[in-house]
Amino acid sequence: MSAPALVALAPGGRDPEAVATITALVAEVRALRPDLRVEVAFLERARPSFDTVVDRLARAGHDEVVVVPLLLTNEGSASGDVLSAVRAAGERHPGLRISASEVLGVSPSFLGVLDERLRDALRVHRVRELDALVLAGEGSGDALANQTVARLARMWGARHHLPVTAAYATTAPPATGEAVRAFRGEGRRHIAVGSLFLAPGALTSRATELALEAGAVAISEPLGAHPEVARGVLARYAVGAVELVPV
């Protein structure tokens, strides 16, 4: 019996750099598990679409599919869109057992990725000293989703023995610029921002712009196509594949 196919499903967007980053991440997943059928798909405004990928898998004879939503927080509307798309695909292909795993989420193992990305940014800007950190995430109207980012921020600060604030690009305060200004108001001058985003995009650009305007000395690139993130995708897939096994 072959393993279920894995579909890594991203929200989508018009930014070609974001699409390229997600595609590269899924290539990392394939490299770690060459025995699996692994596909990338987008919900909207980018190709291949989720429907196209599911139809292709069904035609190829796959009868089980695990969808891993490439979302860092379990934000209500985005997660709802994924579940609606999965249900519709199951109705379109009655012989196909298809389910969605938990969202990729944020794992403590991603702290190493954050460190790596930030070191790269500090090297580019020739920054040798830091006295505060800001962890910038997407933000949500869901307080629990925001608490997940804040929890990771506390872990990141403890790792480096530096004060840290979680900031958000949408909805929830503080914005990255506000967080940087608050630290500067305390007399801190060497403040770096870690980007807790999966790929580039409008929110990432806005968070970066606000942080630089407020005086941040460096802003890291998003997590992107990193083997540790790919392992996170496979961990979600593994749980989803087990749940497909009849009991």
Q: Can you describe what each PLM-predicted range is?
A:
Residues 1-247:
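Active-site-proximal alpha-helix that buttresses catalytic centers in soluble enzyme cores
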